[in-house]
Amino acid sequence: AHASDRDLTNFRREHVGFVFQFYNLIPSLTARENVALITELAPDPMEPEEALHLVGLSARMDHFPAQLSGGEQQRVAIARAIAKRPSVLLCDEPTGALDIRTGMVVLEAIEHINRELGTLTMVITHNAVIADMADRVLTLSDGHITHERRNPQRASVTSLAW
């Protein structure tokens, strides 16, 4: 089936949440305001407070990005992505710029979102350890799938061997 550029844009806007390696937060807006931006575009968004609660940032929602740690900023970015209740969540290197402990907090937040919202979550990473959390793992090389496997037993974040 072929879709127009407009149809694809509308699909992405309504059904896909993006979490980038670099958080792309607006420095002059609080965490709550950064999340609220996306809710203006979505047909049935959750309240920014609910999204921030889901990632464990209820107490930090009125802080500006410069007042947040790297892990907290990444969780604001996740909250912003999930506030529109996407059916697909794409995460590009969500732990790439974080230390191990903070990376684990971010992965736990993503895992929680996946469970709570039933969101199909795709994580793009160079960290092979994270693959043990997935139902299905695809390995890419030069833009092509070179290997595929399924995990019969998904690992929890706390059981990962960093």
Predicted segments — roles?
Residues 1-134, 139-140:
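ABC family nucleotide-binding domain
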Residues 136, 144-162:
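Conserved beta-strand-loop-alpha-helix hinge in the C-terminal portion
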